[in-house]
């Protein structure tokens, strides 16, 4: 339990705005909220899509899911168009402004507001420009690649997961970019012993002696997951264990195929990762960071158009995960991962929750380069 950062008799209030599109934005928000709550802050969380008028938020969520399922290349084309055409980008920023009034009410009384979703950052930046929000706005960049929509004018700070992402954010004009450690739940850690890994395999009914490749595709089971499972199995280097998330149709189809081990929605992902030897992913989001925190090598393969491919490129540039771009590259990547696995380890970057806490309490020194745990403990000592 983290000691309180708040002096007795004071109240510090943090508002976090995410979005229920997949699980990555909400996952980061949830972990930030947990850390800040344990440090003594009052934390409110809001779904940006719920702040949009009428049923617009639900429509956006459904449209995005449909794009990824039925026409994934259209999502990539849209992201490229938003990058290249100012009028289209301006229209999307204006769309985010539809939530501004409710967002201003939701953030009232906060000492700092954190966004883990691009459109929320745009709406908060708009409020800052108009003087309707007078406290710092912090954007936590959930992806390793940074699209221009992430960067909002008048956002006070941007937290990037790696110098690669930080450099992209700076090129796009982001203010006060800082590198932080990923906001990953502490349960994601390497197995402490062979026995712990075997018990995890027993819990999920997994083969005890096989090399296991965990195939992840987000909460929606998006992408060409079936082909990935077949390709991993065909390599004869590992048995695929696929997590289908909430995609019931995918789970049923893979179960009928009889290839590998098929799972649906898994609550205890930390234990499942400790049961496996490597992770094959297609989006480059939170699951990749959780795998690295668990000491597992990660391979990007059959990546989703758009953010999946740009994240894969950034992960590869950072040295965190190779990208097998073609089926004939997968066996070599699997062999390398299984014979010389590399864990991400401690990055030495600041705890993002500590940065937010410092901004909320007026103790911000923009200090980086120290282990995240030391950063938080030093703030605790200073507050006491």
Segments (PLM) and residue ranges:
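Active-site-proximal region of nucleotide-activated glycan assembly enzymes
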Residues: 131-191
